[in-house]
């Protein structure tokens, strides 16, 4: 009897090992190179690879559904010490959410107009609250949904190829994915400029704006990734040290002045205005080439989106990340009920005539009452994180 008791654990060991292997295969099953997202474990690192290079790694609903549970599983796994996210191809980390699919769903009355935003914000919140160090390699175009997959993580590594923007007001949306949280927390009124005009930041300027935490040469990323994977049971500090060493070795544009430096006083003054109408007026009064260019950009945007965005940033400046996602979900559903999102997608992505017919067509026609209604709670339909 005693022998049996002693032997039992030995018999169970191979079975336990098999269970672990099967569980590992379950959690890393999306490794087919044809899959839209690859989820793999290498050493102590969980690696997420966005794998839709032909559409600039646009984030589909299916990808969101795969990434969220994997991040949660790795967060609980004692053998996973960090998470790395990257994009396939040479052009983009992730150019944004799959807005065309969302627009099609909205026209068809499909629930995806609710499901997509709910699950995307849950994923972005999981990244923002992840207990494991999270490293986003934002090489190439990083916009919209791609910003949500990166900006809330511990480490964001930009390269000379990085192009950052939040261009949502051009398609009748607003800078979501937690934009209401991180944008007003950037230096001065940089976040307001980015949100309202869709201004693009490139290369080292993404670091200087406070969006990236590190800057590394694009060609060095495979080596950096290899070194990250090789770290043995790393702490957040160990990972930071490695990233810092690569950052310090990168000399590209090191002496170049931040693209917005010479305009900061102007940006802070103009974008501190209390209303969109006042911002437009200040841009007109300024008359500088920089102000004129921003005015031209704003004049192309959805007036409704501009007013929602300005209020979103003002409210979000004092909110928790979770409260911002709740607010943004309400705004997303207001946009799904409206006109401008579908018109913006038509003009920019479908017909590509770049001539959206916004309704209302002027800022003055977007009432405070309408804006207030967009921020109202949705009762049982509110976002639950």
Curated annotation (Swiss-Prot):
- A GO CC term attached to the entry: mitochondrion
List the InterPro entries.
Answer: ClpP/crotonase-like_dom_sf, ECH_dom, HIBYL-CoA-H
Similarity annotation: Belongs to the enoyl-CoA hydratase/isomerase family.
Please describe what this protein does.
Hydrolyzes 3-hydroxyisobutyryl-CoA (HIBYL-CoA), a saline catabolite. Has high activity toward isobutyryl-CoA. Could be an isobutyryl-CoA dehydrogenase that functions in valine catabolism. Also hydrolyzes 3-hydroxypropanoyl-CoA.
Per UniProt, substrate binds at: 120, 145, 168, 176
**Pfam families assigned to the protein according to its UniProt record, in alphabetical order:** ECH_2
Q: Which UniProt keywords apply?
A: Branched-chain amino acid catabolism, Hydrolase, Mitochondrion, Transit peptide
Q: Which PANTHER family does UniProt cross-reference here?
A: 3-HYDROXYISOBUTYRYL-COA HYDROLASE, MITOCHONDRIAL, 3-HYDROXYISOBUTYRYL-COA HYDROLASE-RELATED
The primary site where this protein sits is mitochondrion
Compartment(s) of residence: Mitochondrion
Single GO biological process annotation from the record: valine catabolic process
Q: Does the keyword ATP-binding apply?
A: no
Report the source organism. Answer: Gallus gallus (Chicken)
Name listed for the protein in its UniProt record: 3-hydroxyisobutyryl-CoA hydrolase, mitochondrial
Enzyme class, one word? Answer: hydrolase
> What's a single GO MF annotation on this record?
3-hydroxyisobutyryl-CoA hydrolase activity
Q: What pathway is this protein said to act in by its record? A: Amino-acid degradation; L-valine degradation
Give the catalysed reaction(s), semicolon-separated: 3-hydroxy-2-methylpropanoyl-CoA + H2O = 3-hydroxy-2-methylpropanoate + CoA + H(+)
State the organism's lineage: Eukaryota, Metazoa, Chordata, Craniata, Vertebrata
Top-level taxon in the UniProt lineage: Eukaryota
The EC number(s) attached to this protein equal 3.1.2.4
